[in-house]
């Protein structure tokens, strides 16, 4: 997984160099570069953060570099700015099971997520 400060080509070159040092061969089976970072100064970011503040008052939020493989790359051709945000407050159990066996979200988290999307859609009419 690649990130903005070190893209696919640079990362693969470093991996090949390190592998060569130890007499190892490398083969890339599949690779794609990182998806475009969200514009945290743009209108989309402001709408999402305003809605977070409205639905989850007092909740802190912050942009960060997401190294996970998200669907954002699939939307780049039709969307200039893809905000990656899940309106769910995960508990310790959900964090431990993320992408694992029996991954789940507590039903208690769902009303907040529904409220968030209702407000986001309502605020953007």
Model feature map: region roles:
Residues 1-118, 122-125:
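Metal-dependent amide/peptide-bond hydrolase catalytic core
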């Amino acid at each position: 997984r690649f990130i903005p400060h070190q893209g696919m080509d640079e990362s693969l070159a470093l991996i090949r160099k390190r592998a060569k040092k130890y007499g190892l061969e490398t083969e890339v089976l599949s690779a794609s570069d990182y998806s475009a970072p969200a514009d945290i100064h743009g209108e989309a970011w402001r709408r999402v953060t305003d809605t977070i503040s409205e639905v989850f008052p007092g909740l802190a939020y912050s942009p960060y570099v997401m190294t996970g493989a998200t669907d954002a790359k699939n939307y780049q051709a039709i969307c200039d700015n893809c905000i990656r945000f899940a309106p769910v407050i995960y508990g310790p159990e959900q964090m431990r099971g993320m992408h694992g066996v029996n991954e789940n979200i507590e039903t208690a988290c769902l009303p907040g997520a529904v409220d968030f999307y209702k407000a986001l859609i309502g605020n953007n009419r």
